[in-house]
Amino acid sequence: MEVENAVIPTQEQMAGFLAPGPDGPISMVNLLKFKDKASYDDSRETELTGAEAYAIYSRGVMKTLAKVGGKLVFSGEVSRLMLGEVEELWDSVAIAQYPSRAAMLEMMQLPEYQEISVHRSAGLAGQLNIETANAVIF
């Protein structure tokens, strides 16, 4: 399995996201890798680390998640790899749940989400987003 971190989805990935999705809630598993130092597209000066810039984004996302009926299910720092092998570990894992794929898209289009997303881009070196559906409680 080849793993490639990204910050922006490809056209093919976006087309899949815009297609009709599963009925009901989805959960997005986010594997996050932060930059050592935040880097803003507008070249603003900053002393923030990537994790600090992403934390600004995260605080704003909590508000926009609630507006579309979503919620943060889990968030934690990666401490070690228990099984398998990767070249480099992610820094953090977060799982957000949305009422539907359409609700996630609605959130991404909110003006306040657009405003805070600059901190996401500034802080992330890469990310994997894994959509899950049909949650099962074991």
Go through the PLM ranges and name each one.
Residues I95-F138:
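Short, Lys/Arg-rich amphipathic alpha-helical interaction segments
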